[in-house]
A protein has these predicted regions:
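Acidic, low-complexity, intrinsically disordered interaction modules
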Residues: 26-93
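N-terminal trafficking/processing presequences and adjacent post-cleavage segments
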Residues: 1-38
Length: 94
């Protein structure tokens, strides 16, 4: 279980993504659960130093931390059951 402080930060981060057009809360929680290094970076980066953007062409939602960029690429499609989407997360360190 994630700490309440981290969950609040994830909700705040997600509000930015919602404002850009997509709810990524579940994907953010999954990411910090699977990647301790990313969890530590999110916990230790001040919110004011984070930046958020959307790449319309690639349908990606981007979170920039001080030393890495996390992009959530949205893949959409439709099949016999109707529309679907998948989120792919990519991390670049600099």
């Amino acid at each position: 279980m994630l700490e309440e402080k981290l969950l609040k930060k994830i909700k705040t981060i997600n509000e930015n993504f919602i404002n850009l057009g997509f709810d990524l809360e579940e994907d953010l929680i999954e990411l910090v659960t699977q990647r301790e290094d990313i969890r530590d970076r999110i916990e230790n980066t001040k919110y004011k130093k984070m930046t958020f953007s959307k790449d319309e062409e690639a349908n990606s939602y981007i979170l920039n931390l001080e030393d890495c960029q996390i992009s959530f690429d949205i893949i959409e499609g439709e099949d016999g059951e109707g529309p679907w989407f998948e989120v792919e997360c990519n991390i670049i360190f600099f």
